[in-house]
Structure formats: structure tokens, C-alpha cells
Amino acid sequence: MIGFGIYVTASLFLFDRSEYENYLSPFYSPPVGFPEWLPTWLTPAVFVLWIPLGFRATCYYYRKAYYRSFFWDPPACSSKAQQREPRSPENYRGETALFVLNNIHRYFLYGSLIVLVFLWYDTALAFLPQGSFGISLGSIIFLINVSLISAYTLSCHSLRHLIGGQVDCYSCVTGGNARRKAYNWLSVLNRQHALWAWLSLFSLLITDIYVRLLLAGAITDLRIL
């Protein structure tokens, strides 16, 4: 997680190019204009990247991971681990002060769903070099990446709750049957939410690094079809 944050920060300030032919780095999607009044050491990604980063930083799974890893709070959920808890139970105050901002996770979800649409659009373009259909190593990497990001986003606990978590009687609400099926499908995805979180994190890095290597001329894109 720390390494990912360092890499993303470096991308914001050190790399001024994000596109190679029909490949756009996922960190820069959707592409936005760059106002002239902003300093040149910034990149357009600053207008976009805060959405998926905020979504991950406030994610229920990632919160559990960094609370345990960085703060040892709590160390785990077992009774023995709770006995090693560094603070007494009566002093627990939940997520307060700065961490209360984690409650805006749902709003980051809305923004991430919009970004996801653009990522799928970018993936479609990756299969259309010079305007005609083609398959290459890069397009496959893009497809795997957006599929993993989709699995992570759609397995979100907040999305699952929005679809059907607050419904006690599906037959009593409009579209209840469709919501029930969607809720059950999202529940299947949700069981592996932690797995999707890590796989999509690494796929983002791999996809961006692949574009960077192409831009640097270090590698060539392998054309398959």
C-alpha cells in the first residue's frame, strides 16, 4: 500500500506523458484539459486520480488493513488478539477526528463508477489500433486490468447495501426481483472483495508501467492479431 502511494505520487509529479498510441494510462482516465494557470510540474491526473484513491483509502477492507498494519488497532478480531489490544475497551471511540471522513466512502463510489465507464472506453480503444480491430499484449493487459477494477468496484460493500441491503421485503418494492438477483450476484463478488482489492491494485501498476515502458521505447507492443 505504501509502495502504491509512492508510485502514484511520483506519477503525478514526474511523468508529463500518459498516452502511447491508443493506450491511455489508467491513472489519467478520463483525460481532462490542463489549465494554463496551473504550475507545469503538475499533471492532469490531479483532477482525476483523487477519486479512485479516495475510494480505496475509505474502502472497508483497506481501512481494516491499514488500521491493523499501521496502528495495530485492533490487531485482529480473535479473543486473544483483543486481549493484546493496546487500549482499554472503554476508551474506544470509533472513527473520529480525521478518520470520520471515511464515512464519505459511498460518494467516492459514485465517482469511481463514472471513472470505471471511461476505463472500459479506454480498453475498447486499446483493441482499435488505427481504427481497426486488433489484439496485442497491451490490449490484453488493459482488459485484465479493467476487469479486475470492475470486480473490485462492484464487490464494494456500499454498492451491495445500496442495491438491496436495506430492503426487508423484495416483493414489496418496485423492481424487487431484479434487485434481489443483483444483490445476490454482488454478494458473490463481495465474498472475494479483499482479493479483488489487491489484484486490481497490482493490475493498475502493471498497466501503467507497461505504458511507461512503451513511451520510453524500452519495449515494443507485441501484436497478436
Where are these regions (language model features)?
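Membrane-embedded alpha-helical bundles that constitute the cytochrome b-like, heme-associated redox core
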Residues: 1-225
